[in-house]
Amino acid sequence: MKLAMKLDRPLVVFDIESTGVNARQDRIIELAAIRVEPDGTETEKCWLLNPGVPIPPETTAIHGITDDIVKNCPTFADAAAEIEAFFRDCDLSGFNADRFDIPCLEEEFARTGRNFASGDRRHVDVQRIYHKKEPRDLTAAVKFYCGRDHAGAHGAEADTRATLDVLK
């Protein structure tokens, strides 16, 4: 399925699972991204990351990621160069990305001494688009626009794919 919008540069659709809901202080533990080229070619990547801090049980209850799962994973600093390369010269999209995912990504890059420069990119926040029609969550958006259930909700890979499907 092709995007409804015409791209003049790549678009990265992404989702983050983190240690909490504070984009400025919590840490990324899962980052899934789909890079869509102007010709429609898609490249998917998912990083499972060790946040360097304990994952609160109430957060694990939402996404299922435990300290044991990430204990041998790279930190964000270890993966920063690869993540930066994947996102290079791309516009950004996600569900609630403007209020959470983008600020969270900016903070993680800042902790490594890198400038993510999201202000130089266009943002397509699917939540804003959806809320203009029907104020709900990503699961409701997938049901409404795609006519299917959102299997794997609160998993970054499933949420990223669902966000791209809503965009299409």
What are the functions of these language-model segments?
Residues G155-L167:
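Acidic, divalent-metal-coordinating active-site segment for phosphoryl/phosphodiester hydrolysis
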Residues M1-D120, P135-H154:
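Conserved non-catalytic scaffold segment of RNase H-like nuclease domains
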Residues S18-G20, R128, A162:
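Short, glycine/acidic-enriched loop or turn micro-motifs at the edges of active sites
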Residues H123-P135:
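Short, flexible loop segments at boundaries between secondary-structure elements
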